[in-house]
Each structure stands twice: as C-alpha cells, then as structure tokens.
Amino acid sequence: MKILFIACYSPLINNSASIETLQYLNNLAKIDENEVHLLTVNFPKNSIYYDEYILSMLNEKVKMHIISGGKIFEKIMPKKPSNKVAVNSSQNNKSFIKSMLKKGKSIIAVPDMYFNWAKAASKSGIELMKKEKFDVMFSMHEPPSSHICAMKIKEEFKDLPWVTYWSDPWLKDSTRENISPVRRKYEQSFERKVVNLSDRFIFVTKANRDDYVNSY
C-alpha cells in the first residue's frame, strides 16, 4: 500500500506530536507491503527545534518530502547560537521572539503558523499524487494546517481515501477559547469541511470523538 502521510510536526523536531508521528510512521513502514511518503514542514538544522537524534530513529524506508514554511516563517524561527559568545544574547533574543510570537499568533496565524506551508505543501502533494498514485492519505492534528493541506489534496482527488487523526479538539481547544467570533466562524468552516471530506477518523479520547459526532 502506498501511503501519503501529512504532518507539520515530524521527526525533524522533538515534541509530543512529532513523537506520535514517529511512532505511526515507523509502524506503517515496517509492514513490508507499505511504501510511506511523509509530507512535512522544513525545520532547518540551525533551528532550535531541529533534533538529529529523533530523526535518526525514523525508519529509513520512509520517503521525506520537506516543504518550506515560507519566508516569514523561516525568518522568525529561533536559531541556534553560532558561537559561545552569542549564547546569552541569543537566549535573550529567543525569549523576546517567543513572547512576540505568542502575541502575534492569534492575530496573523490563522488557524496556525503553518497555513502558508499548507497551501504550498498541498501543491506538492497534488503533484506527488499524480506521480505516485497513493492508495490512502493520512493527516495528523495537531496543528490544524496538516488537515488543511490534506483537505486541498482531497478536493483534487475525491476518490482518495483520507484518514484524519485528532489528538485534541480544533475549535474547542483551550488555546482558542478567546478568539474573535469572526475568526471562530472562519476556522469552523475549515473544520467542518475537513470532517465532511474525511473517510475515516482516529480520536485519542472518546470524549473528543463524541463531541465531533454531536457537532458534525
């Protein structure tokens, strides 16, 4: 089976979502009949998020397609200090950047910081689909842009089976409690479309599953 696996958070970095992605990829790749392609965000080696050790744990059979998050995304991404002298100033800059990102995310990052990536990656995914003729597509939430990327591919290939993974709620996540009504309505239109186009769902908790069943 040829699988297109879409995840913003991949084994290029080290967080809980990337570890989940790593486990899924490795378990899928160890099945002899499977050919797994990963479509993900580019986290350069000089990014503070890049983790060579986690990446080394990824099954070498997985084919990676790494797409840039865009010029703005790569510009504001915190970088590793280039030398020892720069460590303190780098840490101060890192704290400043993080605080600014938190303030700005709710304004410019809708639904998240990877939306521009989703648009670019979906175009790459469409070309990949034409070439590879995938049997199934799998996308990982969090963040929502993984699903948005997959949604755009699904719109082009309506017969492609699409499995969506939900680690947390989207709109009802605690980080979105105070978003504006306009933004809520905008994001809900995406969430509804993703749910309507999905063929299969994987939920981490029964409560989350029941909420989506009741909502959609």
Regions found by a protein language model. Name each.
Residues 161-163, 171-193:
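Nucleotide-sugar donor phosphate/pyrophosphate-binding loop at the beta->alpha transition
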Residues 139, 203-204:
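Short beta-strand scaffold positions
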Residues 41-119:
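A conserved catalytic-core segment of Leloir-type glycosyltransferases
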Residues 145-148, 152, 182-201:
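Membrane-proximal helix-turn-helix segments that form the acceptor-binding/catalytic region
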Residues 196-197, 202, 209-216:
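Helix-loop-beta element that forms the nucleotide-linked donor phosphate-binding surface
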Residues 1-72, 200, 206-209:
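N-terminal subdomain of nucleotide-sugar transferases
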Residues 109, 121, 125-146, 160-163:
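Short N-terminal targeting/anchoring amphipathic segment
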